[in-house]
Amino acid sequence: ILGRGYNMEFKVIESAKDPLFNEALKLYDDKLDIGLDEDSKIFKRSLENNKTENDYAFIVGIENQTVVSLATAHYEATTNSAFLIYLIAKESPNHDERMSLTLEAIEKQLNLLSQEVHNRDINFIMLEVPKEPSTVDIDDKLRNALEYRRQFLFENQFEKQDDIDYIHPNQNQKETPQKVDLFIKANIELTKDIYGTSVKSNYILKYVFANGISREIIYPLLKEMNLR
């Protein structure tokens, strides 16, 4: 158990056999109306494949024996940075507090991994966020959800970075990559020469090793982002 919020406790999921794993996936499936969704098999693969299993943080927030939030992230040990993939909370009057406590809990877990390797906290966390939509693109519900996400990130010390023209990769050759925004929460002063290398390392860890996307797709995208 990582710790408790107001009436929330947090647990680390280390195996797909953990009963909380399926409960967390159900919450994930229910929230797929926003963000960059993935096949739920990738959660299992990230927990179990030898390239990512020791550096994958998967936590759930529990209230009254029910999973009400989840967060997943990859810790990139070489550059001492992390890639926050999902941060989700069940809708409720205290949704904002659940989100903040869950973010705090995943940061604690990532810092535990960092302390084991470097004896200090992580340098930064990165997170992909869909671009701000034009007024004609989407309905009000989704626009509000996207605006809320950005506001939440700003309130929790994330900053949108503009040095990298960031691209979310296509899973296969039939799909097309998407331009998205990259938000970063830094614990040290960052310049592009520091975080560019880290972003590249996180990108490869996540998309080549966890998602299993071909290097033939990933490396040209890194080149396009000037990260090769």
Place the predicted regions along the sequence by residue:
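Terminal substrate-recognition subdomain of acyl/acetyltransferases
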Residues: 3-9, 13-16, 115-228
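Conserved acetyl-CoA-binding loop-helix of GNAT-fold acetyltransferases
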Residues: 94-114
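A conserved beta-strand-loop-helix scaffold within acyl/acetyltransferase catalytic domains
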Residues: 21, 25-91
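Surface-exposed cleft-lining segments at the edges of enzyme active sites
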Residues: 89-94, 135-138
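"Short basic amphipathic alpha-helical interaction patches in structured regions
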Residues: 85-87, 99-103, 140-143
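Alpha-helix termini
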Residues: 50-51, 109-120
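Long, low-complexity, intrinsically disordered N-terminal extensions of eukaryotic proteins, enriched
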Residues: 1-33
